Amino acid sequence: MTPEPRHQGDYTDRQVDAARRVLVDVAQVLAAFRNAMVVVGGWVPDLLFPAADPRHVGSIDVDLALDAVKLGDGRYAELLKLLLDTGRYDKGDKDFQLITTVDLGDGEVPVRVEVEFLASSDVKLKKNHPKLVEGFRVLRFPACAAAFEHPESIEFEGQMISGATNTVRLQVASLPDFIIMKAHALAGRDKPKDVYDLCYCLDEYPDAIGVVAADWRSRHEDPLVAASIQILREKFTAVEHYGPQQLAIFHDSTDDGERAMHARRAFELVQKLLSLL
């Protein structure tokens, strides 16, 4: 099992390129299930605003939230079968993931990419009997429910695992819902890229803070929104607190002034959002 990346330098061009090919590949294979799944995780910023400068670092895996309501009557099993039947995907190290390898054609070792499946904690996906993949299950993540509030349909072009160029469409978590999921992730694990993704979105998306604040105010009674606000208040109380320091860790600068600058920026972005709520 490969260690979780913690720094910007851990996201190499080869790994990101391979993961993007898998994203395109999955979008093509599961085109019939487009309305039953939403891209969450590290590819969301890249897909929502691909022309941003500086560019988002991307991701080295693919995270998909599954809509249990639309995956009844055995469609969940059918979704998995479509991927497995390509011969390109196998069971991963974790119960909720499939893996594939991508040959980038550069003479280097093929890159392993993980595809992970998530669902809200309050839903159940019907299992198939006999099981297609022994021990396979989706990862339960309460905030995953936010992905299905207002997903955006995104069309994008890229290479598939085979190297063929393709244009595909996927549902992608909206900016306000993505920030909800990232806030909840902050409360449940130690992954510096969560803060990088969150702050990148607030910094680069047009009027991001205003957009998120307006959406969250309209949903102030939503428990996921209320919890997100509380988490951000706790984690970003001051520059020295956990949230801002996570951004400094991700950028991994050896210069104390630069580390302080990143932490300060994270603190200011989140505090500006909180001030509007």
Model-found features: residue ranges?
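Compositionally biased terminal segments of proteins
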Residues: M1-L277
